[in-house]
């Protein structure tokens, strides 16, 4: 297996899983920050503007500037350049950018039920369950919009998008 992508719901232990995966395989980690930095270098668009493409809400000026579309195009280019190398773990939103026509990619999704994620978020951030649930709802909306924009699919955790869907709360 040359490339492993890991996409995760928030508070599903993605960082720990990816860290262990990289340590065990010796593969190079490519993060969203790496892809954003490369896309910024390729395009001349500042990193914070490119990073906004991961948010469900586009800029109010997007109709005029097409900033979201330009940022996404450069992120796709950065991902395409990254996958030329072998033995990669691509974690985060960027893993969804790897072409579906590449057959040596293992696509993994990490997810847990909302109750477990809320409890983990509340403990980690020292906030109420209600505040944690609001944060998770917002982050899930961002992930759902990302998957909708790329694949016209409404469920970011849909099994047909991945080779493996692993529950992290079991």
Describe the role of every protein-language-model region.
Residues 3-5, 87-89:
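Residue-level preference for the first positions of well-ordered beta-strands
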Residues 101-124, 129-139:
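Conserved phosphate-donor/acceptor-positioning beta-strand/loop module used by diverse small-molecule
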Residues 34-87, 94:
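ATP-dependent small-molecule kinase phosphotransfer cores
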Residues 129-170:
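Small-molecule kinase domains that catalyze NTP-dependent phosphoryl transfer to phosphate-bearing small molecules
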Residues 95-96, 112-117, 170:
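Conserved nucleotide-binding/hydrolysis micro-motifs of P-loop NTPases
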Residues 5-22:
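Glycine-rich phosphate-binding P-loop
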Residues 97-103, 157-159:
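Short loop/helix-cap segments at secondary-structure boundaries that form the rim of catalytic
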């Amino acid at each position: 297996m040359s490339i492993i992508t890991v996409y995760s719901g928030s508070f599903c232990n993605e960082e720990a899983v990816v860290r262990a995966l990289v340590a065990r395989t010796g593969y190079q980690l490519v993060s969203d920050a790496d892809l954003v930095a490369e896309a910024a270098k390729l395009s001349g668009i500042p990193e914070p503007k490119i990073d906004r493409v991961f948010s469900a809400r586009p800029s109010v000026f997007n109709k005029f500037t097409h900033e979201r579309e330009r940022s996404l195009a450069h992120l796709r280019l950065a991902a395409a350049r990254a996958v030329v190398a072998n033995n990669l773990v691509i974690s985060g939103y960027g893993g969804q950018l790897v072409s579906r026509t590449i057959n040596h990619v293992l696509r993994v999704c990490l997810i847990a039920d909302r109750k477990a994620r809320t409890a983990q978020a509340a403990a980690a951030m020292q906030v109420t369950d209600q505040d944690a649930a609001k944060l998770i709802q917002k982050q899930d909306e961002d992930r759902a919009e990302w998957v909708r924009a790329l694949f016209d699919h409404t469920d970011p955790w849909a099994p047909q998008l991945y080779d493996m869907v692993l529950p992290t709360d079991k």
